[in-house]
Amino acid sequence: MAENSLSDGGPADSVEAAKNASNTEKLTDQVMQNPQVLAALQERLDNVSHTPSSYIETLPKAVKRRINALKQLQVRCAHIEAKFYEEVHDLERKYAALYQPLFDKRREFITGDVEPTDAESAWHSENEEDDKLAGDMKNKVVIAEKEAAAVEELNPKGIPEFWFTIFRNVDMLSELVQEYDEPILKHLQDIKVKFSDPGQPMSFVLEFHFEPNDYFTNPVLTKTYKMKSEPDKADPFSFEGPEIVDCDGCTIDWKKGKNVTVKTIKKKQKHKGRGTVRTITKQVPNESFFNFFSPLKASGDGESLDEDSEFTLASDFEIGHFFRERIVPRAVLYFTGEAIEDDDNFEEGEEGEEEELEGDEEGEDEDDADVNPKKEPIQPAECKQQ
């Protein structure tokens, strides 16, 4: 038993351990009071940061070399991706030619040049509620038809104001349209998208076809959007696909006194010496949708645009892209409002998800027991990029 007590350490060992601990504390205090030691520790802490770039700086040179090799591979991936989008553009051009006969037929129906056959105009709703409502209304329709038999049936040509109605329905476009633009847009008969020819730089043209009118002589107004599908040499990792980089409009041949993009103002001037007053007139720019055909130019001389100009140009690019991707391919659905309802439902769904998340967070603050760990995660909304 005595041997075991000695091996386990006696009072003398405890005293020695306490003395060592005290000495260690004193030594630590002395070290921490040394300004040079504190400076070295602070420098060490400053270098250890949670930001990725700071972390990379702390890596050995050999590891940094391998990371540079990975970046080289990433640049090569970006160039392959650029080629992929170029081929996608070629496919878009190919299928645009297949769509065009259908769009030409659409124009004929809209303008009234061709009347659709019974087979072409037959449309069966998939909405049961609409079908039921249609059935309930049959008798009323029959009665109404009998009452209208004595009255000449109105039958306007084609679909009046088709494209103007789309402009009015779509917020992005209606914001551009002034009251004095409306009579002109009622003459718009068609909008087409034309892609650049094979082997030419990527671009597309929006063609706005107008019937003869009292405002300008051009049968077609055009807007060309130039695109780029290659990584930026200065920042190759920012590449995310083709982007619109510039656009060109066209000259509108306005008839006398019909140019809505300018307005005439009168200004009185007083002569300093004689005190006489004269009235002068001058033209100043006027807000109008038709300024769309006189766009700002992207800076090509290395000088950056001011913030307002950059915003205006970016908005222009967005509108051009929207015409190409949404309005022209799905025109009838924007005319009826169905496409707009789909867009609104999509946005409301996103807002609902945010509200639900906020509600969950509040619940966690009040009572953690209400948290359901098996709740399915909210899926991110799908986003389409250019």
Swiss-Prot record:
GO terms for cellular component: chromatin; cytoplasm; dendrite; neuronal cell body; nucleus. It is found in: Nucleus; Cytoplasm. Polyglutamylated and polyglycylated. These 2 modifications occur exclusively on glutamate residues and result in either polyglutamate or polyglycine chains on the gamma-carboxyl group. Both modifications can coexist on the same protein on adjacent residues, and lowering polyglycylation levels increases polyglutamylation, and reciprocally. Polyglutamylated by TTLL4. Phosphorylated at the G0/G1 boundary but it is not phosphorylated in S-phase. Phosphorylated protein remains in the cytoplasm in a complex with histones during the G0/G1 transition, whereas dephosphorylation triggers its transport into the nucleus at the G1/S-boundary. Belongs to the nucleosome assembly protein (NAP) family. Its main location: nucleus. Acts as a histone chaperone in nucleosome assembly. Pfam families: NAP (PF00956). It comes from Rattus norvegicus. It comes from the Eukaryota. PANTHER family: TESTIS-SPECIFIC Y-ENCODED PROTEIN (PTHR11875). The modification Phosphoserine is found at residues 5, 7, 49, 53-54, 125, 304. The modification Phosphothreonine is found at residues 51, 58. The modification N6-acetyllysine is found at residues 105, 146. A motif (Nuclear localization signal) lies at residues 265-271. This is Nucleosome assembly protein 1-like 4. The keyword Oxidoreductase does not apply. Residues 339-370 have a biased composition (Acidic residues). Residues 1-28, 339-386 are annotated as: Disordered. The modification N-acetylalanine is found at residue 2. GO terms for molecular function: chromatin binding; histone binding; nucleosome binding. Keywords: Acetylation, Chaperone, Cytoplasm, Nucleus, Phosphoprotein. Interacts with core (H2A, H2B, H3, H4) and linker (H1) histones. GO terms for biological process: nucleosome assembly.
